[in-house]
Regions:
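Bacterial Sec-dependent N-terminal signal peptides
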Residues: 1-28
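Hydrophobic alpha-helical segments and their boundary regions
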Residues: 4-11, 55-56, 81-82, 86-91, ...
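Prokaryotic Sec-type signal peptides and long signal-anchor helices
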Residues: 8-10, 15, 98, 212-215
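A generic structural signal for solvent-exposed, polar alpha-helical segments
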Residues: 10-17, 74, 84, 379, ...
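Well-ordered beta-sheet/strand-loop patches within structured domains
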Residues: 22-70, 135, 142, 162, ...
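Cationic-aromatic interfacial patches
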Residues: 24-168
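A sensor for short, sequence-defined functional sites
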Residues: 150-154, 168-191, 197, 270
């Protein structure tokens, strides 16, 4: 009995603080009788209670939001003594239209907040409900603003992406809340992405929405390696014609089932318009790649637009300056920009799927003239050693030297059958010159993957439609034009600096066996030919470069373009965007 009384006493002692705490928080469930006479101290206590008991995602934004409330003594951000829902309605209006950015309102708890707001207007809320509404609005507001400014998904979660993007910090949180108090509508309008590319994708999304309810019969795939050639009959032809009529490449004909039985010139012209838009090979045949693109639903095309708008949010053009280079790995092209306008365009060769070109942002800091090529270990093991087993003359033909412990050796003395991942002690270096795999010019930029832009000794590759053929580096079609782009644009009044740059360009030309162009270059070549040979040029300023992956974009002519997802990254990002929420 004594033990029983002892445990009763212990239970009472433990329970007293809990009962006391529950009693002190009982006002949380009190209905606020008159919003005009709102008890601010009770609301602040309710907000503190809400922040300490609700499990929001443990990201930096949540931490900074809590810190903002703490430093402002848990004052309400959205609810004041005289309840004015204008600011709340303004935020909800923007959230209701978040679909223009590829997300859905309920990913921001739109229904829950709307329900609380309606109750706020038509009934009386408890202090806890007011606190919940206030903190929920704050989280929604910051997530929305930060998402538009920096992206809703961190690209770092994907293996292929190696971009260090900006994130919402304490300064951003403070700025956003200060703007909320004074200029909410202007701030929400100002934070919308406004680059030409982004706005164009939004406009094209609206255009594709017009077709969302349009239906068309699936076009049956052809048998393996089969194609439909110009002038041939195929039962799929009228279905292809019908699909092209929906999006306007082909003029509507109600008798299409009989009008289009043969693959004729009119259909070819319409089909080529579609193939240009989707980056398909232009020829006088229809293959399964074309049929697969035609069979994509309009919802799938819209999803492709949404995914690529998110990619644009990751790297705002404003962070790159007025002059930069953007390699679109998915399109296998390079665009050099000046003031948001394409100044130079060229084809490139990129890494195949098993050797993906890393997606990153950096700065080109130097040009290497007549580079040597140190062969990567993986290529030695997987490719060159296997060739050498059958043909050791490969090394001489390709001007490749073999080294062991720093000394050059005769490759014919090596047992190449013993080379594998665990045993590869040799270093291979290809001599500089016209036969070098890197061509005559290499563009170095800082990165952790030893990749770079470079010329090539195999120019024919640029004629191919599929140029995802490299081991990860990017081969450029027009290296000399890219060199000229990398030089600073000077005002004509700086004649001495212009002459100096022209001479440097001529030194590059002379070093790769091209004729010099400038008067200064010609005079220097005559008077002092030795100084005309150079090995490297350090750029000043450095040129920003983005290795990007846009499977949907607007071309320089203002036309929307879709590209094959060669690295299968669209579906990964789409899943993350769909799964995005506040928790």
């Amino acid at each position: 009995m004594k033990h029983f009384n002892f445990y009763i006493c212990i239970f009472i002692l433990i329970s007293l603080p809990l009962l006391s705490n529950a009693s002190s928080k009982s006002f949380l469930f009190d209905t606020v009788p008159d919003y005009k006479n709102l008890n601010n101290s009770r609301l602040e206590s309710a907000i503190k209670f809400e922040l300490t008991t609700t499990n929001y995602s443990p990201d930096t934004k949540s931490i900074f939001i809590k810190r903002w409330y703490e430093t402002h003594k848990f004052q309400s951000i959205w609810i004041q003594s005289s309840i004015n829902t204008l600011k709340i309605d303004t935020l909800l209006n923007f959230i209701s239209h978040v679909g223009v950015h590829g997300l859905k309102p309920d990913q921001f708890d739109y229904s829950t907040i709307s329900e609380l707001c309606n109750k706020l207007k038509n009934e009386k809320l408890t202090y806890l409900e007011l606190a919940r509404l206030d903190t929920k609005l704050s989280y929604v507001y910051i997530q929305y603003c930060a998402g538009l400014k920096y992206g809703f998904i961190n690209p770092g979660i994907f293996e292929a992406y190696h971009k260090s993007i900006q994130k919402a910090d304490s300064v951003f949180i403070s700025t956003s809340f200060n703007e909320e108090r004074t200029h909410l509508l202007k701030y929400l309008s100002r934070i919308q992405p406004k680059t030409k590319s982004y706005l164009s994708l939004q406009a094209e999304k609206d255009n594709f929405k017009k077709f969302i309810d349009s239906t068309f019969a699936p076009i049956p795939l052809l048998t393996y390696k089969q194609t439909v050639k110009l002038g041939e009959y195929n039962p799929a032809i009228p279905l292809i014609a019908r699909r092209l009529m929906i999006t306007g490449e082909l003029h509507y004909d109600p008798m299409y089932m009989t009008s289009y039985q043969i693959f004729n010139r009119r259909l070819l012209k319409a089909l080529d318009l579609f193939r240009i838009k989707t980056g398909l090979l232009i020829d006088e045949e229809i293959g399964n790649s074309t049929i697969n693109a035609l069979n994509m639903t309009f919802a799938e095309y819209i999803n492709k637009i949404d995914v690529n708008m998110e990619r644009l949010r990751w790297i705002p053009v404003s962070s790159l300056g007025n002059k930069y280079i953007r390699v679109n790995v998915a399109d296998m092209t390079l665009n050099a920009f000046k003031n948001d306008t394409v100044a130079l365009n060229m084809r490139v060769c990129v890494g195949r799927q098993k050797n993906m070109t890393p997606l990153l942002q950096s700065k080109i800091f130097e040009l290497v003239i007549n580079p040597t090529w140190t062969v990567p270990n993986s290529i030695i093991v997987k490719e060159i050693a296997r060739i050498a087993i059958k043909d050791v003359s490969y090394f001489e033909r390709n001007h490749i030297r073999v080294y062991l412990l720093g000394k050059e050796i005769d490759p014919s003395t090596v047992d190449w059958t013993k080379i594998n991942v665990n045993h590869q002690p040799y270093k291979m270096v290809q001599d500089s010159g016209s036969a070098n795999s890197l061509g005559r010019i290499k563009f170095n930029f800082q990165n952790a993957f030893s990749v770079y832009l470079h010329d090539t000794n195999s120019k024919g590759a640029f004629k191919h439609h599929d140029r995802a053929i490299s081991h990860g580096c990017v081969r450029v079609e027009k290296p000399l034009e890219l060199v000229n782009f990398c030089f600073p644009d000077l005002n004509p009044i700086y004649k001495t600096r212009i002459q100096k740059n022209d001479l440097l360009k001529d030194k590059i030309r002379h070093s790769i066996d091209l004729s010099v162009l400038s008067k200064t270059g010609k005079e220097t070549l005559k008077s002092n030919p030795k100084i005309m040979k150079i090995k490297r040029v350090v750029l000043n300023p450095y040129i920003p470069i983005v290795m990007d992956y846009q499977t949907c974009f607007i071309n320089p002519k203002g036309k929307i373009q879709f590209r094959d997802d060669i690295y299968k990254l669209d579906s990964l990002l789409s899943k993350q965007l769909t799964a995005f929420n506040l928790n």
